[in-house]
C-alpha cells in the first residue's frame, strides 16, 4: 500500500494525500476528512520516521493516565481517552500514553518523551492548585491543553483549558431533589483544597442557600468504603436527612450501602459511570466526548496556526443529570 494507492482510491492527487498527512492546514476541511476516511478504510500507514524528518513534527499528542483507584472513579478517564484517540485520529494525530506518580515524576517523563518521541503537544489531566506541570510547559513554550481548570490561575488562565462545570452538575442534582420534596439534603465530598471537589461542593451549597436551607456535609478521600463510612456518620448526626449529593459515583455507591431498612434516602452521584448504570444510581453525566473534541480542536489550531488566536481558549461545558431509581 502506497500513497499513490490512497490517492487513486480517494480520487485526489498524490500531493493532496501528502498534504493531508504532513501539512493538513493547506487542505480544505472537506477534502482532508475524505482523504483521512479513505486512509482509515484502506489501512494505510505512512512511514512515521520519514514524515517526522520532513516536517519536524511527530503528529503525537502525549497524555498521562491516572491510577484506577477503586476501579470506578477512574472509568471516566477510559471514556475520555477513547474519545480523545478517535478525535485525534480524525485530525491526523496519534495519542501517546504515559504514567507518572506526581508532578515531579510527570515533568521528568516530559523530558524523556521529548528526547525519545518528540510529541507535538501534551494534554494535562488531574489539574490542581499550584500545578507544577503547567508552569514547566509554559516556561518552555510547549503546546498543551488542560482537561481541567488551572485552579491557581483563575480567572486569568495563561493557557488553554477545557472542563466540565462541576458546580452546575451538583446544582442540577440538588434542584432535582428539592423538586422531589427533599429539604434536608447532605453532601459527601472530598477534603477542601481540591479544585474539582470544591467546585462540586459549591453547586450544592449555593443551591441550598438560594432556598434558605442549610445542610450537613462530610469530606473524605474518594472510594466506596469511605463513602459508606461518611454517609453513616452524616445520617446518624442528622436523622432528618432524606437525600445525599455525592462528589463521585464511588462515594455515592458507598452511600447506597449505608442506607438502613425503613429509612429511605435518595442518593445522587457524579460521573455517570457504568457502575451507576448497573445499580440504577442517578448521576451527573459529563460530556466527555465533547470535552475530548474540544481539547483536540484547541491543540490542532495551535499546532497548525501557531500565530493565530483560537476563538476561545477556555471551554466550560455543561453537564446533565441522568435520572435513575436512586433519586
Predicted regions, residues:
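Flexible loop/hinge segments that line or gate small-molecule binding clefts
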Residues: 125-171, 250, 271-282
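N-terminal helix-turn-helix DNA-binding module of bacterial transcription factors
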Residues: 1-59
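Short acidic/polar active-site loop segments enriched in Thr and Asp
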Residues: 13, 59, 120, 183-185, ...
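Flexible loop/turn connectors
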Residues: 237-327
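Short, well-structured alpha-helical segments in soluble
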Residues: 106-118, 227-239
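Amphipathic helical "hinge" segments at domain boundaries
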Residues: 44-109, 205
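Hinge/beta->alpha junction and helix N-cap segments in small-molecule ligand-binding domains
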Residues: 67-79, 98-106, 162-172, 187-232, ...
